[in-house]
Amino acid sequence: MAGFQHLSVMPEEVLRFLSPRPGGCYLDGTLGGGGHAALVAERCAPGGGTLIGMDRDLEALKAAAERLSRFGDAVRLLHGNFADIATRLDSLGVDALDGFVLDLGVSSHQLDTARRGFSFQQEGALDMRMDGDSGETAADLVNRLPEHELERIIREYGEERWAKRIASFIVRARSEAPIENTLRLVDIIKGAIPKAKWEERLHPATRTFQALRIAVNHELESLERGLKSAIDRLKPGGRGVVISFHSLEDRIVKHVFREYAAGCTCPRNLPVCVCGRQPRVRVLTGRPVTATEEELRDNPRSRSAKLRAVEKL
């Protein structure tokens, strides 16, 4: 699948924090086109190491299989949501990991393939499903949900201050005809946001499309569940690296890392600890790492990327 092109974000930083070693077992839970996975496999495959790649997008999985074929049996690929990491690793008989990486961004290929429905710049079916063949589509949501629920999704997942007007305009438009393609929804959103309030460097539909994509794919719930499962599987000294692309994702990553890094939670007035809680990870990134100026020039989509990393104690 030569058409599946995706520039991996912060490749050098991922390798620096993950520190993959020969013979180790590593997981890429959001495989995409296999860019990060290839970098990790190059370092862990010697000495009998394994790279496990997982993605819910079959097109991405097929592209990655081609890209990673040179590593032979050192690479094992799984189709599924990284929220189910625990059960999928069990099915492989993998009890522990030396490291994992999660790149939470939508790939360039997904954005640029009109029929997937992720892009607000191309006409296509209003789909937005990562796996492409199960669950409700974005069209299902915008045509079925009551106005107050649409408003909540757009406000919470898109952090869109015009959520109330956008939801109202959607409900009004769907009463005339079902909303089934991307550009019709874009026109509705543009009509809802006063043109004088459009942001200079942000398309008016950006936040609403993000919100619908998150809702369709249950992204935030999947992130928290999958991230905790991956940390639980790390060996002592094993590392986890996560790249997020918006504040909702980054907030969850930061919260989970802090939760696992926390020690005693007893009230301060107790003379001795009775909870027995010990830190389970060490946070390696006090502040999130961002792309260099050079990378921003080469890959503008890295602009919003934030990398956080932990090490299992």
Curated annotation (Swiss-Prot):
Positions that bind S-adenosyl-L-methionine: 34-36, 55, 82, 103, 110
GO molecular function, one term: rRNA (cytosine-N4-)-methyltransferase activity
UniProt family annotation: Belongs to the methyltransferase superfamily. RsmH family.
Leader sequence residues: none
Catalytic class of the enzyme: transferase
GO biological process, one term: rRNA base methylation
Source superkingdom: Bacteria
The protein's name in its UniProt record: Ribosomal RNA small subunit methyltransferase H
One Pfam family here: Methyltransf_5
Catalytic activity: cytidine(1402) in 16S rRNA + S-adenosyl-L-methionine = N(4)-methylcytidine(1402) in 16S rRNA + S-adenosyl-L-homocysteine + H(+)
Function: Specifically methylates the N4 position of cytidine in position 1402 (C1402) of 16S rRNA.
Cited SUPFAM superfamilies: Putative methyltransferase TM0872, insert domain, S-adenosyl-L-methionine-dependent methyltransferases
GO cellular component, one term: cytoplasm
The enzyme's E.C. designation: 2.1.1.199
PANTHER family assigned: 12S RRNA N4-METHYLCYTIDINE METHYLTRANSFERASE, S-ADENOSYL-METHYLTRANSFERASE MRAW
Localization, UniProt: Cytoplasm
Alphabetical keyword list: Cytoplasm, Methyltransferase, rRNA processing, S-adenosyl-L-methionine, Transferase
